[in-house]
Amino acid sequence: MLNYKKYKRFETIKLKDRTWPDNEITKAPIWCSVDLRDGNQALINPMTVEEKIEFFNLLVKLGFKEIEIGFPSASQIEYDFLRRLVDENLIPDDVMVQVLTQARPHLIKRTFESLKNVKKAIVHIYNSTSVLQRDVVFNMSKEEIKEIAVEGTKLVKEYAKDFEGEILLEYSPESFTEIGRAHV
């Protein structure tokens, strides 16, 4: 971010036989803004592409180096927004954009179509893992739900092979907190 050295660090207390508490963070973490992602399609008055560009430029000015910009396979506005960023060369070389998509083949394909000519991107896939959704919505076993994640990951890796830019993969289990320890 802008100036992570602005604040003085606290002095650590050295205690014998202690290991990890003595570790220190000596550089700023990587912050990823998710302010532009997912949900635009659900708003009564969604942001326009122009508003999203203005917001993106502000995040860049603030110093964000990773910006999750949307769910281009779920919303035409978010798809168009990403394409404008790329076509108008608005993504700085030191900024990596991130896109979100469910771990479903047709959505992953559409996501990679939206990323054409992006230099660096994180493809963030997810699938639901909660017992309720697994049983009621998907009518699938725990193993079948795991397979969705595995197949989605394989598909992202396959598309990434032919992608001209740099692709990083991020996976998240949706509704993970609803699983419970017995179901992990």
Give the role of each language-model region.
Residues F112, S130-E158, L169-E178:
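Hydrophobic alpha-helical hairpins/lids featuring a short glycine-rich hinge
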Residues T26-P29, G63-K65, I91-V97, K119-A121, ...:
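Short, well-ordered coil/turn segments that N-cap beta-strands
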Residues A182-V184:
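Conserved small/polar residues in nucleotide/adenosyl-binding loops
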Residues W20-N45, H124-F138, E166-E170:
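N-terminal small/glycine-rich loop or linker at the start of catalytic domains
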Residues K65-I91, V95, V99-L100, N127-V137, ...:
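Glycine-rich, proline-tolerant flexible connector loops at the mouths of alpha/beta enzymes
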Residues E51-P72:
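Catalytic domains of carbohydrate-active enzymes, especially glycoside hydrolases
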Residues P105-V131, E143:
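Hydrophobic or amphipathic alpha-helical targeting/insertion segments
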Residues R83-P92, R110-A121, K154-E164:
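Acidic (Asp/Glu)-rich catalytic clusters
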